[in-house]
UniProtKB/Swiss-Prot annotation:
Signal peptide: 1-19
Classification via CDD domains: LPMO_AA9
GO BP: cellulose catabolic process
One Pfam family recorded for the sequence: AA9
Name of the protein: AA9 family lytic polysaccharide monooxygenase D
Species classification: Eukaryota, Fungi, Dikarya, Ascomycota, Pezizomycotina
Length: 246
């Protein structure tokens, strides 16, 4: 784990910490499971035991983001210096996964969920080799001009994604992401907040769709990344690969 990258004054982090959130837990098959908690970083530094969760370790201690100029780096996969979780939650194909954010302040931007089949243990898979399939996406409601992030905020900072019923059983990583677009009018102004959770999928599905590497999801000049969100929109191209619905 690249812990040394976070050894800077905590006081400098306070404004950002108060502003953004992260996925602190999920509900799958109706069961709540805690995810990675920022406080665990301090436990690691202080050599204090902390709970093992299906949420991946990551080093965004300031609750910061991955900027467009980092889209080709491994940080876009599961956030900054992410490291595999050692345990997994479970969900049935056709069921739902509820992603619970600690908080969220920005009501402009899409919400997306991807899955990647580990092809074995998700605790040891190389994140750079994962191929991702987008199973959920939501942009803006053109009738109300309410963005998906606004809907998430109104729903107690929670988002629910349905697992395609035809998805083959296996060991998966779910990648849930908000793209904050309040700064999208300027180059490198979008903010990506990806978080990963190990979830085993059960069921009788047989579909194993081909995925793509996370480092190829987005470009800094994509029309859904660099544009003016402060006008009435009648169209919006959600960033990333095509949605797979099963």
């Amino acid at each position: 784990m690249h812990l040394l990258s976070l050894l800077f004054p905590v006081i400098a982090l306070i404004p950002t910490v108060l502003s953004h959130g992260y996925v602190s837990g999920i509900v799958a098959n109706g069961v709540y499971t805690a995810g990675w908690q920022v406080s665990y970083w301090y436990d690691i530094i202080n050599k204090v035991p902390y709970p093992q969760t299906p949420g991946w370790y990551e080093e965004a201690l300031d609750l910061g983001f991955v900027a467009p100029d980092q889209y080709s780096t491994s940080d876009i996969i599961c956030h900054k210096n992410a490291v595999n979780a050692n345990v997994s939650a479970t969900v049935a194909a056709g069921g739902t996964v509820q992603f619970q954010w600690t908080t969220w302040p920005h009501n402009i931007g899409p919400v997306l969920t991807y899955v990647a089949n580990c092809g074995g243990s998700c605790s040891t898979v190389n994140k750079n080799n994962l191929k991702w399939v987008k199973i959920d996406q939501s942009g803006i409601n053109f009738s109300t001009q309410v963005w998906a992030t606004g809907a998430l905020m109104a729903n107690n900072n929670t988002w629910t994604s349905t697992v395609p019923k035809t998805l083959a059983a296996g060991h998966y990583i779910f990648r849930h992401e908000i793209i904050a677009l309040h700064g999208a009018t300027t180059a490198n102004g979008a903010q990506n907040y990806p978080f990963c959770v190990n979830i085993d999928v059960t069921g009788s599905g047989t579909a194993s769709p081909a995925g793509v590497a996370a480092t190829s999801f987005y470009k800094a000049t994509d029309p859904g990344i660099l544009f003016n969100p402060y006008v009435t929109l009648s169209n919006y191209t959600i960033p990333g690969p095509a949605l797979w619905t099963g």
